[in-house]
Amino acid sequence: MKLFMVLVASFAFAVALPSKKREETAAENELTGDLQEAAQPMIYAVAFPEIRASCVIGWKQQGATCQRDCECCGVAATCITGDSSTGFCGYHQTPNALGQGILYTADTIKNGFSAIFCAG
């Protein structure tokens, strides 16, 4: 009789256990869906950053004509002249990542000194 009670109890426990697991799985799926919905705006913010106007009124945007570096909007933006006296606002580019970092740093320092001379 005790063996029968042990078998019945273990069978009842085995039947009840998977249903609890299904409930837990459903709750986990719901939480996962909520997490994905909450993460979607963050993914969008990383993929499409907000463009903020950080330039002083009167500074020229990339591609506009210029004569001096201090006229261009951007920390490392320079007036690329080429052969003529008037140029356009832009950034020096190189396919090498290290070279690009060096150009960016050099242009930033040059723009710092250029801003001092343009203010006067």
Curated annotation (Swiss-Prot):
Disulfide bonds join 55-73, 66-79, 70-118, 72-89. The keyword Secreted applies. The keyword ATP-binding does not apply. It is found in: Secreted. Expressed by the venom gland. Residues 1-16 form the signal peptide. One of its GO terms (cellular component) is extracellular region. One of its GO terms (molecular function) is ion channel regulator activity. It comes from the Eukaryota. Keywords: Disulfide bond, Ion channel impairing toxin, Knottin, Secreted, Signal, Toxin. Belongs to the neurotoxin 03 (Tx2) family. 03 subfamily. Ion channel inhibitor. The presence of a 'disulfide through disulfide knot' structurally defines this protein as a knottin. This is U15-barytoxin-Tl1c. It comes from Trittame loki (Brush-footed trapdoor spider).
